[in-house]
C-alpha cells in the first residue's frame, strides 16, 4: 500500500532560538557603520522568517497522510512530542507500506527525525547506514531522473495540469487564524502528491477527481 504524506512547519518563538542565530558578517566593501548594522538587521530578520525551514529553529505543526481510496487524515497536536509519538506509532503499524512524499528524503524525514531527537521521541529503524530505508519514495528525486534538478510541488502540479493556486497567506499564519483552511491546504497537497505519483508511474492509480 502506498501512503502519501507531508508536513507543515513553523518557526519557534524568537526567544527560544536567538542563541542559535549565526553571526552575520557584512561584505568587506561595507565601511559605513550604519550600513553595516542595517545589513546585519536585514539578515537577522531573514533568518527569523526562514526559521520554519530548519529543525534547529522550527517545529512540526501538523502531518497529513492519505491512504489509498481514503480522505486525508492528520496528526495535529499543540504538543509536538505527542504529535511525533503518534506519527511514529502509525509508521510502526504500517512499516510494510511505502510512504510517498515530495521532498521527503531531503526535508520531511530529516525534519521529523531531528525534532524527534530534541523531544526525546524514539525514532523507528528507518535508516540503512546514513541512507533512508526503501520504505520512502521521494517524488522530487524521481523527477530528477538521476540528476540534481529540483522543483516545487506547486510548479510540478501546474506542469501536470492541476489547478494549484498559490497561498495568499503564509501557512503558519493560516494555521493560527483559520485551522480548517489550513487543513484543506494540507489535504490538497497530499492529493497532489498522489496524483503526480500516479502520472509518474510510482503510485498505483486511484479513481478520484481533482477539484
Model-predicted segments: where are they?
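Metal-dependent phosphoesterase core characteristic of DEDDh/y 3'-5' exonuclease domains
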Residues: 58-77, 96-211
